[in-house]
Swiss-Prot record:
Quaternary structure and interacting proteins, as annotated: Binds to myosin II chains myo2 and myo3. Interacts with vps27 and a PI 4-kinase pik1.
Superkingdom of origin: Eukaryota
Pfam families on file: EF-hand_7 (PF13499)
Gene: cdc4
InterPro entries, sorted: CALM/Myosin/TropC-like, EF-hand-dom_pair, EF_Hand_1_Ca_BS, EF_hand_dom
Keyword Cell division: yes
Organism in which the protein naturally occurs: Schizosaccharomyces pombe (strain 972 / ATCC 24843)
Protein localization: Cytoplasm
One of the protein's GO biological processes: division septum assembly
PTM comment, free text: Phosphorylated on either Ser-2 or Ser-6 but not both. Phosphorylation is not essential for the function of the protein.
Protein name according to UniProt: Myosin regulatory light chain cdc4
Role of this protein: Involved in cytokinesis. Required for the formation and function of the contractile ring.
Length: 141
């Protein structure tokens, strides 16, 4: 298969809105995610700091194939422990409001739009979410 037909080239072309063979470096995180990677915001910031304002396919492939790869999403138990801090009664449940606060205000922050999209697929019972199930669902996607 030639490079022109690769899924990476196809994804790159979708981000190359002007057909110049270059994309803005600010699109690199979204492009990496479109190619199945899961870079953290810190990784994206580090990568963007090393790139010119616009990135060509060859530069993108160097980023995509970087020697140390990208951080793995993490162990489910680590995420569960993080939510347990907010579970004062040890019920395995967290309020939707608290979940929204945690995910939009702490660590790798989600936007409100991302949070709304995420909550569409989460079973909510009496304003509460089972965070064990939530973690499994997120990591499965």
């Amino acid at each position: 298969m030639s490079t022109d037909d690769s899924p990476y080239k196809q994804a790159f072309s979708l981000f190359d809105r002007h057909g110049t063979g270059r994309i803005p470096k600010t699109s690199i995180g979204d492009l990496l995610r479109a190619c199945g990677q899961n870079p953290t915001l810190a990784e994206i910031t580090e990568i963007e700091s090393t790139l010119p304002a616009e990135v060509d396919m060859e530069q993108f492939l160097q980023v995509l194939n970087r020697p140390n790869g990208f951080d793995m999403p993490g162990d489910p138990e680590e995420f569960v422990k993080g939510f347990q801090v907010f579970d004062k009664d040890a019920t395995g449940m967290i309020g939707v409001g608290e979940l929204r606060y945690v995910l939009t205000s702490l660590g790798e922050k989600l936007s409100n739009e991302e949070m709304d999209e995420l909550l569409k697929g989460v079973p909510v019972k009496d304003g509460m979410v089972n965070y064990h199930d939530f973690v499994q669902m997120i990591l499965a996607n």
